[in-house]
């Protein structure tokens, strides 16, 4: 994923959120409903990291697990998930199924 696509994904979460929940899905099968966001913030990624495409993340909270993942690769801490370069979802939708963003391979 290039930096432009990564930032687009972050801004879709940040810009869309108007109080309506969003559904986020990961490749491990985890599917959650999120009711709030922290906004975009700087993270600890460094330019020398092999998978560096940016130093920004977004936190989603008030997380309700709709489907459990098949591993623990996505951490839910204090009812929140940090979406960052090491934790990129596969798909983001509205509750009605309208796709807001989908990962390109």
Q: Over which residues does each language-model region extend?
A:
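Conserved RNA-binding domains used in RNP assembly and mRNA/RNA metabolism
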Residues: 2-21, 25-27, 31-105
């Amino acid at each position: 994923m290039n930096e432009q696509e990564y930032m687009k994904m972050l801004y879709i979460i940040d810009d869309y959120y108007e109080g309506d929940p969003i559904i986020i899905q990961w490749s491990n099968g985890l599917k959650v409903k999120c009711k709030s966001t922290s906004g975009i913030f700087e993270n600890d990624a460094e330019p020398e990291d092999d998978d560096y495409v940016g130093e920004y993340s977004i936190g989603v909270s008030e997380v309700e697990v709709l489907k459990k993942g098949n591993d623990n690769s996505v951490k839910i801490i204090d009812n929140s998930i940090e979406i960052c370069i090491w934790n990129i979802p596969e798909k983001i939708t509205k509750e009605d199924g309208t796709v807001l963003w989908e990962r390109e391979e």
